[in-house]
């Protein structure tokens, strides 16, 4: 199995939309966004690649998943951090090492540019949690708060 990672192109929109709908299927998320909101991350990755990185994951040339990574400054580490907004791998490609290869790709791409990789994982996602812990991720004790509205 040949795994390839590449940045989004406009031609990826339909395939991204197919996969992002699966990513946001309950019970994996707390809130199910509209189609427009789901596609906004794809558009942001094309429009603002310095802040939002859209990455297609391919296996032997076939779409196998995608990732959305946001770049932000974090005072705690005194530098830039990559926030894994979404990391999705289709069912047929899970447990084949793609997650580990993705993080190796990301580390190579962002070497010397970031000081932290940050992500969220739900309690129900035991497989992902094991992967992240094996890669050295640790839980933070923070409880996050948000306010959603158009400012």
Question: What do these predicted regions represent?
Answer:
Residues 57, 95-100:
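Glycine-rich acyl-CoA binding loop
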Residues 24-43:
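Conserved GNAT-fold acetyl-CoA-binding loop/helix
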Residues 44-56, 83:
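A short helix-loop-beta-strand connector motif used in the catalytic cores of GNAT acetyltransferases and
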Residues 110-120:
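Conserved GNAT acetyl-CoA-binding A-motif
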